[in-house]
């Protein structure tokens, strides 16, 4: 089973809010998920609001889940991808 870390869209029209989730790559965008690991609000007042459970994200990355391009950028901004790369090089 190919697993991806990706965004599912919530919120109303022209006011998006996203959950960062782990899901089977074959399931629909807003379909069944395996686990929610964070949220992303691009329309918050000052700057985009990002909340990610770092331990869960690293667990899924180490288990082989592939992040989408957008989620990869979000995790990079949070410093999670850097920690993942360091863990991978240490092995």
UniProtKB/Swiss-Prot annotation:
Family, similarity comment: Belongs to the bacterial ribosomal protein bS16 family.
Keywords: Ribonucleoprotein, Ribosomal protein
Identification of the protein by name: Small ribosomal subunit protein bS16
GO MF entry, a single one: structural constituent of ribosome
UniProt cross-references to HAMAP family, sorted A to Z: Ribosomal_bS16
Keyword flag Ribosomal protein: yes
Pfam families linked: Ribosomal_S16
GO cellular component: cytoplasm; small ribosomal subunit
One biological process term in Gene Ontology: translation
């Amino acid at each position: 089973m190919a697993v991806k870390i990706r965004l599912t869209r919530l919120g109303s029209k022209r006011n998006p809010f996203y959950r960062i989730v782990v899901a089977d790559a074959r399931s629909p965008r807003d379909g069944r998920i395996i686990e929610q690991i964070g949220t992303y609000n691009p329309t918050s007042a000052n700057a985009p609001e990002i909340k990610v459970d770092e331990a869960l994200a690293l667990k899924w990355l180490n288990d082989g889940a592939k992040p989408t391009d957008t989620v990869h950028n979000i995790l990079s901004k949070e410093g999670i991808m850097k920690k993942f790369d360091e863990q991978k090089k240490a092995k």
